[in-house]
Each structure stands twice: as structure tokens, then as C-alpha cells.
């Protein structure tokens, strides 16, 4: 036991762990938007407005996007980042940065008990020190149990007290089924405000495809006729049962 304690005391961060934790374990989505590295996003204005309305609140200002896989939850975050870059958000949100947090990377390589908690706490401390940052956690239901071991805390228990503090904001995304795991934890559930992201209609999907049409044409070096967009939405909705619009319609066009 003494040798293990000595090893832990002598432990130093690897080279990749030195430096700002947000740069190591996160991705600045607003920076990618500013550099033009994000795909253009279309539609979902209602969900975006609802999310911004929650973000500008004084309390209970942590939205979580709840919807089936492929309906465009991450696209809403990218659209939000683009709006920030173009100053098309309420003044309270101007100049904010959206940083996507990679929980898997925080967990990866944790060799000692308490190392995950140390990494995660470093990230939270940096966010609290920079109130302009909004963190985004995809598959946020995974925070329950992430990093937990006998005698240690999981990410949810570390995050819960921080969510109620001013100067810290978090956006989550998860599926309808997995959100039930958050609902089972009353303390965590009341800190998040769910936003239902429904599957778009065929007409809404066609509008999204029209927006993506120039980038798809440029990538494949072809001309995509308007009828093909309508047909991909109709046929994918009719014959592909295990996936959701607009993702499956985009894949039909991309694979054709």
C-alpha cells in the first residue's frame, strides 16, 4: 500500500495532460464556426429560440436537447455557435464560447482512484473562472456512472452542485429513452430544462436538404435536381424504419 501511495504522490501529468484542461478535453465549437469548419445548418429555429430563452435566464438555465438519434440535436448546437459568431443572439449571449466536452477522453488513461475526479474538477474550475464559456456534453446521460469506482464520485455527483452556481452553464443532448436515466435523479433532473427535438416532417426535411444541396453538389461534383431531394425524403421516410429524418434522407442523397 505504501508503494502505491508513493507512486500516486510522485505522479506527474503526461505531456498531453499539461496545459488548460478545456483545450485537452474539449473542442471549441464557436472557434470552428469562426474558421468555417462547420457544416451549414438549417431549420430548427423553434428549438434554437427555446434553447436561447433558457440560456438567458438567471436560474435553471441549463437546457438539454432530448430527441431520437439523427434528428439534428448536434446541428442545433452548431447553428447556435454560428449565430454567436455572427452576433445573431441576445446581447446576454454575445461573445460566448461553446466548448464540447469529451467525457471519454477525461476517463481514458485514468490509472489511479481519484484521477478522473481531479481531471473533471480541473475542467469545471476553468469554466467557472471564464463565465463566457458554455460547455456542451453530448450523450449527457453518461455522466451517471462515468468515472465511478468503489469509494469515488461519478461525474453526475461532481456536476450537480456546480450546475446551481452562477457563472456556469451547460447544454446537454440525449435521446428520449436515455433521458429517463436523468429523470430518475431528482437533484440532477431539476437542474436541467428539457427541450423536445422532434423528427422533422417530410416538408421540413426537404427544406433542410435544399440548404445542404450546395455543399453536397460541391463535394460530389454533381448537380442534384430538386426532385431528387423530395424523393430522398419521401422514400427514406417510407422504407427506412430504424432511423430518423433528416439523417436518413441526407444519407440517401450522399450515398446515391
Task: Spell out what each predicted region is.
Residues 108, 125, 197, 221, ...:
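Amphipathic alpha-helical interaction elements
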Residues 193-206, 219-229:
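Conserved AAA+ ATPase "SRH/arginine-finger" region at the nucleotide-binding site
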Residues 1-107, 117-130, 136-142, 148, ...:
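Histone-fold recognition with a strong bias for associated Lys/Arg-rich disordered tails
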Residues 96, 104-115, 200-205, 232:
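Flexible, glycine-rich beta-alpha linker
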Residues 218-227, 231-256:
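C-terminal helical "lid" subdomain and adjoining coupling/linker elements of P-loop NTPases
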Amino acid at each position: 500500500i505504501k508503494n502505491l501511495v508513493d507512486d500516486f504522490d510522485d505522479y506527474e501529468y503526461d505531456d498531453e495532460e499539461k496545459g488548460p484542461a478545456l483545450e485537452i478535453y474539449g473542442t471549441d465549437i464557436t472557434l470552428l464556426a469562426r474558421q468555417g469548419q462547420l457544416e451549414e445548418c438549417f431549420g430548427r429555429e423553434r428549438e434554437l429560440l427555446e434553447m436561447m430563452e433558457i440560456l438567458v435566464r438567471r436560474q435553471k438555465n441549463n437546457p438539454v436537447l432530448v430527441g431520437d438519434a439523427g434528428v439534428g440535436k448536434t446541428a442545433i448546437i452548431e447553428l447556435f455557435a454560428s449565430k454567436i459568431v455572427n452576433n445573431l443572439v441576445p446581447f446576454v449571449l454575445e461573445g460566448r464560447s461553446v466548448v464540447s466536452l469529451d467525457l471519454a477522453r477525461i476517463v481514458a488513461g485514468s490509472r489511479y482512484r481519484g484521477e478522473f475526479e481531479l481531471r473533471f474538477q480541473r475542467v469545471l474550475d476553468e469554466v467557472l473562472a471564464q463565465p463566457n464559456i458554455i460547455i456542451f456534453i453530448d450523450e449527457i446521460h453518461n455522466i451517471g456512472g462515468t468515472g465511478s469506482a468503489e469509494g469515488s464520485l461519478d461525474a453526475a455527483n461532481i456536476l450537480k452542485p456546480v450546475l446551481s452556481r452562477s457563472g456556469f452553464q451547460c447544454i446537454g443532448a440525449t435521446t428520449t429513452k436515455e433521458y429517463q436515466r436523468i429523470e430518475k435523479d431528482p437533484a440532477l433532473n431539476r437542474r436541467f430544462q428539457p427541450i423536445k427535438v422532434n423528427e422533422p416532417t417530410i416538408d421540413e426535411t426537404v427544406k433542410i436538404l435544399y440548404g445542404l444541396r450546395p455543399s453536397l453538389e460541391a463535394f460530389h461534383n454533381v448537380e442534384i435536381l430538386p426532385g431528387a431531394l423530395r424523393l430522398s425524403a419521401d422514400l427514406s421516410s417510407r422504407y427506412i424504419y430504424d432511423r430518423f429524418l433528416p439523417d436518413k434522407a441526407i444519407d440517401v442523397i450522399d450515398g446515391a
